[in-house]
Amino acid sequence: MTQPTHFHPSLLPLDGGINFRDLGGNLAADGRRIKRGLLFRSGSLDSLSAKDCDFLSRGPAAQIIDYRDADEVLSKPDVLWQGASYHNIPANPLSSEVNANLEKLTNETLATFDARAFMLELYRRLPFSNLAYKQLSGLLQNCASPEHATASIVQHCAVGKDRTGVGSALVLFALGADESTVLEDYLLTETTLAPFREHMLAQLSLKLNAQALGQFAFVLSAKEEFIQTALRSIQERYGSREQWLQQEFGLGSLEREKLQSYFLE
């Protein structure tokens, strides 16, 4: 993996990073901003170089939460750096109908595949009864506690878009960010993932036909319609994102205030 050609200030300077971004700097509660160097989102960590690991080890001790399925992890295990702790909690909905594991898509499955319907259903389901995001909530609260006040969190999936996109929305909302900030962060992936997406599609073009490749390209995109589907589903079920945070993840107003005291400046 080469250095990203579509540079953005939130991207970490990693040789083998995939869409590895710092959520720091985003506007959150009361006009405060998220501290840099504490909350990260990324794609797979399997291609990190020794230089990357040295760079990452200089920051706060990382709690890594890997949203990928077991077969994804087995195929491309994370490269861990010194001081990092690893948690693998799959975030895919408990259904064979929708699955963010893109490696399961083939010419045959893509032939009768409705990419848009697939993506919208994935985003309808991701926000609810999701053990991975419950784990994320717990890690956030642990990091904000006095005894763990030097820890950071890296949440990631395969490309850092869908499973990580909803997880990042959870973090941003818990810290008091508004919807426009959540949308902006999500849509940034369309740019920051571009080098890896182009590389992946070039490889897939060797084994997928044009129709299948077009479907795959759509699935690899970060469209506002996707994240808006998740946000609308949250609103329809709970009436507000605050109720969603409290009912699904135990993040009531008091818990959110504690997170904001630690993660914001």
Question: Where do the language-model regions lie?
Answer:
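Ser/Thr-glycine-rich phosphate-binding loops at phosphate-binding pockets of nucleotides
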Residues: 159, 163-164
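Cys-dependent protein tyrosine phosphatase-like superfamily
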Residues: 1-154, 167-265
